């Protein structure tokens, strides 16, 4: 091992095709020998041979998602000298991304993430070929994109896309490195490795083999809603790059049994490993009984949104069940006299369904906090809810008595950070009978507190 930070940098530089002074020597007829000569005072890494480096330089790797996972993964693969790197993402850089999406810079806020990432990668290593796919991955395009690459990295954060990526990788015979991260935990898997043909039991399992059923739609939490510790997602992205290098440079004899690696920042030990089974005999995509094909994926017959129970937020509620922040403030204005004393006119109940840690950062005046997690965990069937509203059963523990009272018909408006969880909460509250059969307004503030900042209060904290 290197004895100093400087020596360690020399070792990594040799792997990446650079010398200790950050001079690239890729054009040399014997680049591996020259770089190895520069670090002869250190131990030579036995797993990184000349053959390994040549494999890396001829490899074509596709990274789906240029966010918290994709940025560190791309950074280390570019540094390792991977020949071609493709990036797929349709999002633009936001200031709230910068703490964890390490390729992006403040100057690139508003720029497409793939363009921002490639700009940084070229500064790191100008020699690889970088390919930008400036759109979210769609079923009709996935196969046409994937076919040009040797290895796929899933750096996304939603189940529907994960299943799409895995299915397409299996059907095209591409190994897949998949990772996820939320809050202080992460998961990592190498799937479809070795990438045998559909129906071949000796191939590595796919995402459907590990998770044949998606999680309940109302249990899914994004980084924007649940939060993420930057080093956690960075750790998982770096490990994706490491696994990608191992897949690229391995021989058939070196393929390891499939495993699920679980990282928890506040546990000891930090990592746990669970051995995975081989391909499921009835898997919908990689078994002999497969029903998912490239044709069903491309045509839309395999409906990933329906399979995952994901409904676009705009489809959860009717227009009359929603109100924009501007419309809300117009309907319930702050009067001149009340502004002078720092209060507002009598307003309906505002329920903020963010988790308490976010509510404590900032909150609308007179709003109350009922976290969405409490609402979902305590929700009951509609028939039982009607009984609750009539007082024949105990109230859910999270529901204040004055709001649930059968005498109360004051309007209820629900708000969250981005306008997604609030819609789910409105549906749950109506299932509980709190709309009194339509006599009481129970509505969502469209776009959440982000829209509130844009339409009502430009000074509202953004986090």
UniProtKB/Swiss-Prot annotation:
Query: What highest taxon heads this organism's lineage?
Result: Eukaryota
Q: Where does ATP bind?
A: 68, 89, 96-100, 113, 157-158
Q: In which pathway does it act?
A: tRNA modification; 5-methoxycarbonylmethyl-2-thiouridine-tRNA biosynthesis; Cofactor biosynthesis; molybdopterin biosynthesis
Q: Name one GO biological process term.
A: tRNA wobble position uridine thiolation
EC number(s) from the headed UniProt entry: 2.7.7.80, 2.8.1.11
Per the record, its GO cellular-component terms are: cytosol
The primary site where this protein sits is: cytoplasm
The record lists the catalysed reaction(s) as: [molybdopterin-synthase sulfur-carrier protein]-C-terminal Gly-Gly + ATP + H(+) = [molybdopterin-synthase sulfur-carrier protein]-C-terminal Gly-Gly-AMP + diphosphate; [molybdopterin-synthase sulfur-carrier protein]-C-terminal Gly-Gly-AMP + S-sulfanyl-L-cysteinyl-[cysteine desulfurase] + AH2 = [molybdopterin-synthase sulfur-carrier protein]-C-terminal-Gly-aminoethanethioate + L-cysteinyl-[cysteine desulfurase] + A + AMP + 2 H(+)
Record: active site: 223, 416
Every copy of the Rhodanese domain together lies at: 344-461
Q: What family does this belong to?
A: In the N-terminal section; belongs to the HesA/MoeB/ThiF family. UBA4 subfamily.
Designated name of the protein: Adenylyltransferase and sulfurtransferase uba4
Protein's organism: Aspergillus oryzae (strain ATCC 42149 / RIB 40) (Yellow koji mold)
Recite the lineage of the species.
Eukaryota, Fungi, Dikarya, Ascomycota, Pezizomycotina
């Amino acid at each position: 091992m290197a004895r100093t930070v400087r020596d360690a940098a020399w070792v990594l530089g040799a792997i990446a095709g650079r010398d200790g002074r950050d001079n690239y020597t890729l054009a040399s007829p014997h680049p591996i020998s020259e770089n190895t000569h520069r670090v002869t005072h250190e131990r030579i890494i036995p797993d990184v041979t000349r053959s390994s480096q040549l494999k890396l330089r001829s490899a074509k790797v596709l990274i789906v998602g240029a966010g918290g996972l994709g940025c560190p993964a791309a950074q280390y693969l570019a540094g390792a000298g991977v020949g071609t790197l493709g990036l797929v993402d349709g999002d633009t850089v936001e200031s709230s991304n910068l703490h964890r999406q390490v390729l992006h810079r403040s100057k690139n806020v508003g720029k497409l993430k793939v363009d921002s990432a490639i700009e940084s990668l070229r500064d790191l290593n100008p020699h690889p070929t970088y390919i930008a796919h400036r759109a979210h991955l769609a079923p009709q395009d996935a196969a046409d994109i994937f076919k040009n690459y040797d290895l796929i990295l899933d750096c996304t954060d939603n189940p529907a896309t994960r299943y799409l990526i895995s299915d397409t990788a299996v059907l095209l015979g591409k190994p897949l490195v998949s990772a996820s991260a939320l809050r202080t935990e992460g998961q990592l898997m190498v799937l479809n490795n070795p990438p045998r043909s559909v129906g071949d039991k000796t191939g590595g399992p796919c995402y459907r083999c590990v998770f044949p059923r998606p999680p309940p739609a109302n249990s899914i939490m994004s980084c924007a809603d649940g939060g993420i510790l930057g080093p956690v997602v960075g750790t998982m992205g770096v490990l994706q790059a490491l696994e990608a290098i191992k897949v690229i440079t391995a021989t058939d004899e070196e393929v390891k049994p499939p495993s699920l690696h679980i990282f928890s920042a506040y546990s000891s030990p930090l990592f746990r490993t669970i051995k995975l089974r081989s391909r499921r005999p009835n898997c919908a995509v990689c078994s002999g009984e497969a029903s998912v094909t490239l044709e069903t994926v491309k045509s839309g017959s395999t409906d990933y949104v329906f399979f995952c129970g994901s409904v676009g937020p705009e489809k959860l509620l009717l227009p009359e069940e929603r109100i924009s922040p501007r419309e809300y403030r117009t309907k319930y204005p702050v009067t001149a006299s009340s502004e002078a004393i720092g209060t507002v006119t009598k307003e309906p109940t505002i329920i903020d369904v963010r988790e308490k840690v976010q509510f404590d950062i900032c909150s609308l005046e007179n709003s109350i906090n009922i976290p969405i997690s409490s609402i979902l965990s305590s929700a009951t069937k509609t028939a039982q809810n009607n009984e609750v509203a009539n007082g024949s059963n105990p109230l859910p523990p999270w529901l204040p008595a004055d709001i649930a009272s059968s005498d109360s018909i004051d309007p209820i408006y629900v708000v969250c950070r981005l306008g997604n969880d609030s819609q789910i909460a409105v549906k749950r509250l109506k299932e509980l009978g709190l709309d009194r059969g339509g006599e009481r307004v129970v509505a969502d503030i469209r776009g959440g507190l982000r829209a509130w900042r844009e339409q009502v209060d430009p000074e509202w904290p953004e986090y």
